């Protein structure tokens, strides 16, 4: 896809992100954690999220709001939803279960939207080919990048994330990717992290790394955090220079130290 078209898709997706009323969503969904069971395959929202929000070819620049997305997801799955409700929520109202699933899928959607912004930003700014599919995502790989003759897996890693490394190692053994790169991001501002670093007694180095990461991120007016062009450019340069020697899991702190430039 031509860079100009990739830029248009990126801008359209950022316009969608800017319109999200995050404050209202958080107020509505944050206290609701009533549907925490593993969802059966028939209720997996990943295919729908990719269908509605991942449009790398730019065939359409329309992204539905969350309510429209959820309504369509719900209507397509009435039969498996009935089975799920009978199994786990016998005697509960549909309204109770629906609200719980709304909250569950909203949290999933925010994470996926963050992944997609990274991918759209990459396509608009970088030369190395990026691929993302819901099938890969279901296995713990948010995207994969072709660098030389190496296929590098990507995991977008929020600051508070903890368990992805073990999942990533299993994926590497199973799929034989050359390496798995953790791409860290934080919801905190550089100023907040700098204050924590100054007060820290045992974790100052980690906070300094997150300060460095935060300088490559941008907060939209509604609070949604997105990736700056400098972030993906630094990662691409790192992969071009090191792809042939990378193997196994490349953890977030190594990426922050060696791939990202300082503020």
UniProtKB/Swiss-Prot annotation:
UniProt cross-references to Pfam families, sorted A to Z: RE_TaqI
EC class: hydrolase
Statement: the UniProt record of this protein carries the keyword ATP-binding: no
Lineage: superkingdom: Bacteria
Entry coiled-coil feature ranges: none
GO BP, sorted A to Z: DNA restriction-modification system
Entry GO MF terms: DNA binding; type II site-specific deoxyribonuclease activity
Keywords: Endonuclease, Hydrolase, Nuclease, Restriction system
Enzyme Commission number(s) from the entry: 3.1.21.4
Reaction equations catalysed: Endonucleolytic cleavage of DNA to give specific double-stranded fragments with terminal 5'-phosphates
Name of this protein: Type II restriction enzyme TthHB8I
Source organism (scientific name): Thermus thermophilus (strain ATCC 27634 / DSM 579 / HB8)
């Amino acid at each position: 896809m031509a860079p100009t078209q990739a830029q248009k898709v990126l801008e359209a997706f950022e316009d969608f992100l800017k319109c999200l009323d995050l404050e209202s969503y958080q107020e509505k969904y944050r206290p609701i954690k009533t549907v925490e069971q593993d969802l059966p395959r028939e209720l997996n929202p990943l295919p729908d999220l990719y269908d509605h929000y991942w449009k790398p070819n730019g065939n359409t620049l329309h992204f539905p709001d969350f309510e429209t997305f959820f309504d369509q997801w719900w209507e397509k799955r009435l039969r498996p939803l009935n089975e799920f409700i009978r199994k786990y929520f016998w005697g509960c109202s549909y309204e109770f279960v629906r609200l719980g699933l709304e909250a569950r899928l909203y949290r999933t959607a925010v994470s996926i939207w963050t992944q997609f912004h990274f991918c759209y930003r990459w396509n608009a700014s970088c030369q190395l080919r990026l691929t993302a599919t819901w099938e890969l995502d279901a296995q713990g790989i948010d995207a994969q990048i072709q660098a030389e003759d190496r296929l590098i897996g990507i995991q977008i890693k929020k600051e508070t994330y903890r368990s992805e490394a073990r999942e990533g190692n299993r994926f590497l053994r199973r799929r034989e990717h050359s390496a798995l790169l953790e791409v860290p991001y934080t919801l905190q501002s550089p100023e907040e992290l700098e204050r924590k670093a100054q007060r820290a007694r045992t974790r100052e180095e980690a906070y300094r790394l997150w300060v460095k990461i935060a300088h490559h991120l941008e907060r939209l007016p509604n609070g949604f955090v997105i990736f700056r062009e400098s972030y993906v450019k630094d990662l691409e340069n790192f992969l071009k220079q090191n792809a042939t020697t990378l193997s196994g899991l490349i953890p977030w702190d190594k990426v922050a130290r060696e791939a990202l430039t300082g503020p």
